[in-house]
């Protein structure tokens, strides 16, 4: 049996930026002294004249990006999720979103899988913060293929986009001929009749594995990849809820305000069904190996399986 290919989506982000740079002269990449970690150093090497290191000054970087967008450039401002959504929130809101500027934010190292860097760098609140900003698209890819497609789609979208990428290498799950990416459109990865599992990011692969464990117990789970949290694919979410009668959301984010919040808001108005939110339960993360943290917070396949089985 061949080993499953694993790639960190931050590496996919860096590779995708190079392809964008080759195709579009107006792409500019900005960094805040983290080009190696965000994997945008590859773009810097290929297009040094279109890479700007703003230093450890994330607020200035976002303001700089807004200025570039106002002159017709398409800037990709890159830093850790904690700094992109947290430290620079005011600039994202007032300098980018309020004037509706065409700035793309590449936020790497999101969630607890950042690992040993600990709670100060494990941003589990970024979806909630960015979802609340008017006009902001919020997305998180499940693998290498989806991450690259997302970067291209973000370029094509006119307006601000927040994309979260991960540090941890994750399985490639979208390597199939019929794969199609579109912002705001979810993807059904597994059909099922007993309940629906809705996930994004690295939790998609774990949810698929959990679904197989559930199947062995006679529980048939539908699995949907909702890579775009805003705008949410409400049509797909509502249809799945009506079809299966129960919904579980899984995300490497607080259960407050992220994918789980978006799904609950939608279903409360359009298709009320029982919902279980799996994620970070109103606590901070801690330092440790990524795999150990995912297990501790119930976000590995076994943890998801146990929580879903208890819910059903």
Q: Where are the regions that the model predicts?
A:
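Thiamine diphosphate
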Residues: 1-164, 169, ...
């Amino acid at each position: 049996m061949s080993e499953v290919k694993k790639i960190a989506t931050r590496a996919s982000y860096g590779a995708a930026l190079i392809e964008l740079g080759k195709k579009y002269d107006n792409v500019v990449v900005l960094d805040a002294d983290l080009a190696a970690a965000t994997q945008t150093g590859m773009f810097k090497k290929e297009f040094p004249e279109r890479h700007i290191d703003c230093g450890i000054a994330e607020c200035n970087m976002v303001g700089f990006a807004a200025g570039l967008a106002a002159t017709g450039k398409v800037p990709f401002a890159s830093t850790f999720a904690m700094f992109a959504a947290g430290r620079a929130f005011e600039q994202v809101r007032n300098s980018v979103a309020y004037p509706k500027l065409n700035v793309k934010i590449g936020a790497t190292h999101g969630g607890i899988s950042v690992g040993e860097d600990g709670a100060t760098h494990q941003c589990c609140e970024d979806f909630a913060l960015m979802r609340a900003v008017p006009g902001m698209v919020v997305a998180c890819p499940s693998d290498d293929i989806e991450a690259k497609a997302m970067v291209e789609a973000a370029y094509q979208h006119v307006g601000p986009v927040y994309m979260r990428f991960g540090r941890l290498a994750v399985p490639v799950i979208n390597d199939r001929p019929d794969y199609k990416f579109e912002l705001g459109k979810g993807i059904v990865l597994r059909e099922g009749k007993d309940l629906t599992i809705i996930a994004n990011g690295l939790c998609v692969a774990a949810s698929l594995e959990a679904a197989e464990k559930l199947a062995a117990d006679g529980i048939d789970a539908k699995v949907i990849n909702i890579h775009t949290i805003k705008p949410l694919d409400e049509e797909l979410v509502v249809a799945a809820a009506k079809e299966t009668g129960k919904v579980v959301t899984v995300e490497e984010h607080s259960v407050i305000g992220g994918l789980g919040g978006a799904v609950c808001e939608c279903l409360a108005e359009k298709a009320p069904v029982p919902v279980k939110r799996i994620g970070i339960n109103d606590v901070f993360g801690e330092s440790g190996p990524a795999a150990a943290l995912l297990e501790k917070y119930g976000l590995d396949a076994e943890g998801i399986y146990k929580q879903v089985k208890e819910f059903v």
